[in-house]
Amino acid sequence: MLRRSILISGISGLAAFSGLALAQSMSSSSAEKAMPYSRRPEVKKFIQDVCKRRGLDQNWVAAILDQATYQPKIERLMTPKRAKPGTKDTRKDWEKYRNIFLGAHRLNLGVQFWKDNEVYLERAREIYHVDPAVIIGIIGVETRYGENTGSWKVLDSLVTLSFDYKRRADFFKKELEEFLVILYNNDLKPFEVQGSYAGAVGLPQFMPSSIKRVRADFDGDGKIDINHSTADTIGSIANYLS
């Protein structure tokens, strides 16, 4: 019961900050969206700059980007819904979010996850001085302990948000650059990687720049896997927060 109470407190605090409003998008022209990405002037410059900075092959990067498909739904999802004058505001308040994040199913999953991973959680506390309840709360809020890590193709997400969602293009271009480096260094096929519509991946829903910066091989198997390894996920979150 103590762990359940601590978990409720941890998730409540995290979920309260999760409802940040996302800025409205500014769409590119239809003509641009119908064109292969590598032929668009803005993308050509991006390719040149990234390859110069990171030592990647321009033809390889262009070929990867041309496999991406513009996703209009992602633009819609990134745009907050605002109530029209005279209509009811349907945005969720804390009470509605509380029912989502503190339901019995999620809490039971959290308690079991804590039991199953207690060794790694205590190691994270010792090494990074991060309370296990905070780590548990983050994984619960982000992916429901791995039940929903996202089904969007991350390449589609990041390319759409870099070149067709102008309001936050600079941020997503940096994430796309890091994603391309991850693909190149790990010999991954672009559509093998799935995640959220914003391009976050794995149990902790890290953006590519965070993966590079804080990833931790916490189970000592020589690999860092935040998609399947709860140990690596715990270590990486703790490293991120330390």
Residue locations for each model-derived region?
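N-terminal secretory signal peptides and thylakoid transit peptides that target proteins
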Residues: M1-G13
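Catalytic glycan-binding domains that act on GlcNAc-containing polysaccharides
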Residues: Q58-S242
